[in-house]
Amino acid sequence: DYKLVHHCRNGRSVYSFCMCPGGTVVAAASEPGGVVTNGMSQYSRNERNANAGIVVGITPADFPGDVLAGVEFQRRWESQAFDAGGRNYCAPAQLVGDYIAGRPSTALGSVVPSYTPGVRLTDLSACMPDYAVAAIREALPAFGKQITGYAMNDAVLTGVETRTSSPLRVTRAKRAIACRWA
């Protein structure tokens, strides 16, 4: 169990989320035309890979508009991932070394992705806002200095995990049972 955090020059924070030893990257989409990933481990934790989410902090300022703007923001990137994955529910993926260098991946290395129905090697930058791309590019080498092998060149980034937090917040009034959108 570990927690990695990197505070980037662009003001964003990047952190590891939900490390799954001996785990699998799984499909988690709930709507057609979107790709969403998540990670899990079986009880035995004996699969060939470990996986962890890499998360960039966002705020409501990143998706201004009405109360459902966060949902639309999430759907946008899930749709972009669907397109980048080949529009067949394969997930877009990229090797860490290629991601940091800003070039699309064309062949896997020693790490075999676990995502079913499969991955399509590409450039993940099409699936995230520019500030997230830059933040993760900066954070990965820093994480690699903290945990040997974390940012190895042929590790596989499989995207996108867009549901670490709810895109909508419902608050309750302190002295009533009524709810209001926030």
Question: What residues fall within each predicted segment?
Answer:
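Residues forming the flavin
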Residues: D1-A182
